[in-house]
């Protein structure tokens, strides 16, 4: 999977200047193609996770071009943009928490394959049908959780969730046909920490009993 911040604080720092959008959006599409070029010799990309879109109105982002660019090269790749859902009276309302999302609410960034709202978990009675241009689309919720405390590798990051806690989160996040991303940051050599591997094996045993 790939993480990409739509808002580049260096190249596109002045988000209020709409005259810069076209140039920046072209730059961004080229970057996405470059990332795919780098990864494809080694593996397929199964997910693109986009962030930072709330810094501009949704229509200023080339969501359709982003989607088509990725799908044309990685057809099975799933694509989501953080804080995917808006309000009927304001598609750019931010944030619309999962417990406040209702069937038929507008898809803020269309097209997308699933909903995001990091770091929140799905509501118990999570709706699935959301709207764009009068049509409804099925969109599960994806939760993003760290196996320890940090997203990125850090030598001081040694406080792990217990296998019982992870199993509970797994069931909570995947019921109702939803998705869980469990982050295990690789070290500086690109290897998963031994403690992560041990905990993942224990979790697998726990949830498959």
Give a label for each model feature:
Residues 1-209:
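Mature catalytic domains of secreted/periplasmic carbohydrate-active enzymes
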């Amino acid at each position: 999977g790939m993480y990409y911040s739509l808002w580049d604080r260096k190249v596109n720092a002045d988000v209020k200047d709409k005259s810069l959008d076209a140039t920046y959006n072209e730059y961004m599409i080229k970057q996405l193609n470059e990332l795919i070029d780098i990864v494809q010799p080694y593996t397929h990309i199964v997910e693109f996770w986009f962030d930072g879109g709330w810094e501009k109105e949704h229509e200023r982002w080339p969501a359709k071009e982003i989607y088509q660019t990725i799908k044309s090269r990685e057809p099975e790749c799933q694509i989501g943009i953080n804080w995917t859902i808006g309000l009927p009276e304001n598609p750019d309302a931010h944030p619309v928490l999962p417990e406040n999302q209702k069937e038929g609410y507008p898809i803020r960034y269309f097209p997308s394959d699933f909903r995001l709202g990091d770091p929140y978990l799905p509501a118990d009675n999570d709706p699935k049908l959301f709207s764009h241009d009068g049509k409804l689309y099925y969109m599960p919720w994806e939760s993003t959780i760290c196996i320890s405390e940090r997203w990125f590798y850090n030598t001081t990051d040694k406080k792990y969730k217990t296998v019982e806690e992870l199993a509970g989160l797994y069931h909570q996040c995947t019921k109702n046909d939803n998705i869980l991303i469990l982050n295990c940051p690789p070290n500086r050599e690109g290897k998963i920490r031994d403690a992560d591997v041990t905990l993942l094996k224990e979790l697998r045993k726990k949830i498959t009993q």
